[in-house]
């Protein structure tokens, strides 16, 4: 009887327990591979020893200004070394990192700065004017607003006038700020792994953005999960096509340190730049939304450097990738892994794990299987597709729709200053994603739609994702998104917004519309066929997600379909 108590009563102490934090990965990388290249950005090349010192300098410089535990530091920058260093240097000072979407409006950034009570902001020189405008809005809205300390990052690839403008305002330059710090700074790991490491914000498409708070433990576990689920090896060469400011780059800044790999920064993402980086740096991995994959597939012969020198692994998420795009990427020599997640789950938290028996399948069937969202990450303890009324799992029949819910270490601490949203998100002991899916007999889940994106036409529920997948397989279509448009007869009907491939003759739009509708009729039930087709570029977020809320507004402004027929 006492044996059990003796076993369980052994206490934690400094020798056998340390709070988990991904910051330790940087320490190890600098120790094991000090001379290996850690970060590349144009002519800038840093080793792991140098990156380690630069991050400690950043932590020291912040600490010298009494910025640390309880403070938030914002970073407004594209994929540059300073943003990578911020993922270590800011939490090394004990502060919380808030990476800010560079494509937001000044008013939206002003909201984030005020809501997060930013003590400091590190800003890229090209974005300084945007930040100035945001700070002006903050000051006008609240007399008690305390402006954050500003640091501007210079970049040789940008026009020098932007940097001169910031320096003329008395803002300190990033490299000089680092010089004020100690390269041997003795940073302190968190006492509690529940301590916050990062703050990110949801897109806020229908209301104010919600502040997603992440902890050190989750960041540590999901960094390693990202490597294990993707089969990444030590020394991986990773191309930053995914914005680091989005969900902390899906935790890959920390992953690359754990693997002692090399980060190739890409300030602007184009198919040509991706191909060139693969050829020059021997890139092994990159992450990208389906829209980026689409640009690779449809790149011109002048842009593409083919055949690829080796297999390049691609992690795609952000929206459901059309099977046709996955198939085309595979034919080019890319190995695509589909993942799924949210800001609230540290980025991807499910993965469509590859199975050996798939090797012999036709590429079209393989693409269909790979387009599913898959199974839970190693770092996620619970994943289900639930009937939200009964909170019971739906049958694994590939047909019954439920909501994706999660629980475990990969789920956020909660929303900052938003108890109502926290209560709703964590109802019944699960995190509710708002995504609707089915579970297949093999246990793999597949998203059918966001709950708000389901189109209800008459008595039929139409998945916008399924209609979009059909549109993507049309030879003239480059990009597509489907939303509900008011319909006098059916309440709602599908409205397709379409971007045509370069070179497609669009002089006769009516003929194109008829061709697309005819094509869709051969692929889906009549009630799912788009009743409206609109041509033009689609509005995108920073990570390539289509901004459906804007398209829904546009469809509503178009007025109801008056002669819709099934």
Go through the PLM ranges and name each one.
Residues 52-60, 179-184, 212-233, 241-245, ...:
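Conserved structural elements of the adenylate-forming
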Residues 64-65, 88, 92-179, 502-504:
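Structural core segment of the AMP-binding/adenylate-forming
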Residues 220-237, 245-285, 295, 299-300, ...:
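Conserved AMP-binding/adenylation subdomain of ANL enzymes
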Residues 34-37, 151-158, 165-201, 207-208, ...:
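Conserved pre-ATP/AMP-binding loop-to-beta segment of ANL
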Residues 17-18, 23, 35-88, 105-110, ...:
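Conserved AMP-binding/adenylate-forming core of the ANL superfamily
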Residues 47-49, 197-221:
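Conserved AMP-binding A3 loop
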Residues 175-176, 258, 283-288, 297-368, ...:
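Gly/Ser/Thr-rich phosphate-binding loop
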Residues 75, 104, 121-123, 286, ...:
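AMP-binding/adenylate-forming catalytic core of the ANL superfamily
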């Amino acid at each position: 009887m006492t044996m059990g108590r003796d076993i369980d009563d052994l206490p934690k102490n400094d020798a056998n327990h340390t709070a988990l934090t991904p910051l330790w990965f940087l320490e190890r990388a600098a120790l094991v591979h000090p001379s290996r290249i850690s970060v590349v950005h144009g002519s800038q090349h840093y080793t792991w020893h140098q990156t380690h010192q630069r991050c400690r300098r950043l932590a020291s410089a912040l600490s010298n200004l009494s910025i640390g535990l309880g403070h938030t530091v914002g970073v407004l920058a594209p994929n540059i070394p300073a943003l990578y260093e911020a993922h270590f240097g800011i939490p090394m000072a004990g502060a919380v990192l808030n990476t800010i979407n560079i494509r937001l409006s000044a008013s939206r950034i002003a909201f984030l700065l005020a809501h997060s009570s930013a003590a400091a902001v590190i800003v890229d020189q090209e974005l300084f004017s945007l930040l100035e405008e945001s700070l002006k809005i903050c000051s006008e809205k609240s007399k008690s607003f305390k402006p954050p300390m500003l640091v501007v990052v210079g970049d040789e690839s940008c026009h020098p006038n932007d940097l001169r403008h910031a320096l003329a305002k008395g803002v300190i330059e990033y490299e000089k700020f680092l010089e004020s710090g100690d390269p041997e700074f003795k940073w302190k790991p968190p006492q509690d792994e529940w301590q916050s490491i990062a703050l990110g914000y949801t897109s806020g498409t229908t209301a104010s953005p919600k502040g997603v708070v992440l902890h050190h433990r989750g960041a540590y576990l999901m960094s390693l999960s990202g490597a294990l689920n993707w089969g990444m090896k030590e020394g991986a060469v990773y191309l930053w096509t995914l914005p680091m400011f989005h969900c902390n780059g899906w935790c890959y800044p920390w992953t690359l340190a754990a693997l002692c790999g090399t980060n190739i920064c890409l300030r602007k993402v184009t198919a040509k730049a991706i191909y060139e980086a693969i050829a020059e740096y021997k890139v092994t991995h990159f992450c990208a939304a389906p829209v980026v994959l689409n640009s690779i597939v449809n790149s011109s012969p002048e842009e593409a450097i083919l055949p690829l020198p080796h297999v390049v692994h691609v992690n795609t998420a952000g929206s459901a990738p059309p099977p046709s795009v996955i198939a085309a990427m595979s034919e080019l020599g890319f190995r695509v892994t589909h993942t799924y997640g949210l800001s609230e789950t540290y980025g991807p938290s499910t993965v469509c794990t590859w199975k050996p028996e798939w090797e012999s399948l036709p590429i079209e069937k393989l693409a269909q299987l790979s387009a599913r969202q898959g199974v839970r990450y190693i770092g996620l303890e619970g994943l289900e597709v639930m009937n939200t009324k009964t909170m019971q799992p739906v049958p694994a029949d590939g047909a019954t729709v439920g909501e994706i819910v999660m629980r475990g270490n990969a789920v956020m601490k909660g929303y900052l200053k938003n108890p109502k949203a926290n209560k709703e998100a964590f109802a019944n002991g699960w995190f509710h994603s708002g995504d609707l899916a089915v579970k297949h007999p093999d246990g793999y889940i597949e998203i059918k739609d966001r709950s708000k994106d389901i189109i209800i036409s008459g008595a039929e529920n139409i998945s916008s994702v399924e209609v979009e997948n059909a549109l993507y397989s049309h030879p003239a279509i480059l990009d597509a998104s489907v939303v509900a448009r008011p319909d006098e007869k059916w309440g709602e009907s599908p409205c397709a917004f379409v971007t045509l491939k370069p070179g497609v003759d669009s002089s006769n739009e009516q003929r194109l519309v008829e061709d697309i509708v005819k094509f869709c009729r051969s692929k889906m039930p009549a009630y799912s066929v788009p009743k409206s087709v609109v041509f033009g570029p689609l509005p995108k977020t920073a990570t390539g997600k289509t901004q459906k809320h804007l398209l829904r507004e546009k469809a509503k402004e178009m007025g109801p379909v008056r002669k819709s027929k099934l």
